[in-house]
Amino acid sequence: MATVFDKILDSTTGRKSYDWYRKKVQAMTTPGARALINQGKATLRPKYGVKNLFGYDPKHKDKLPYYDVFPLIFPLEPARGGFIGLNFHYLKPGARVAFLRSLANTTSNKKYDKTTRYRINWRNNLYMRKTAKHYLFNHVRTSFLNITAEEMAIAIFLPVARFKKGSPY
């Protein structure tokens, strides 16, 4: 079964415009975040070097001004009881593109395919302050959908962010 990413990639051979991808994704009737996770290649733990989409129920949600229950993250490093991840949903779409472009020099190769991994030094990147979050394994509610480098330009525009109690923008 082809994933939503496969369908878009198949119809966009040779076209790299982020605006074109964004319009294509918005024109589609995309399944919800949970459906994407269920239909894609999912793992029980986050896969480092690629993006991951998963369901999450924050431990201190009652104290947060807003939070995302379906984060789209780059997991960076293990942390007590979980991991640190960069959630792209905390950035406006234009900033997501700029952030993704800024990561181009951190790739393991220039193929931008299933073999490509990102090596991010999150302590010195402009976009990190707003997006770095500590995720606890015992608050993860779904498997982790692994999103490869070739799917990332599409994934940042999928309307799967689910903020509760407000929005970061």
Regions found by a protein language model. Give the residues of each.
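Intrinsically disordered, low-complexity, charged/polar segments
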Residues: 90-169
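Mixed-charge, Lys/Arg-rich low-complexity intrinsically disordered regions
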Residues: 2-52
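Compositionally biased amphipathic helical and low-complexity segments enriched in hydrophobic
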Residues: 10, 37, 54, 75, ...
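A residue-identity detector for tryptophan
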Residues: 20-21, 56, 122
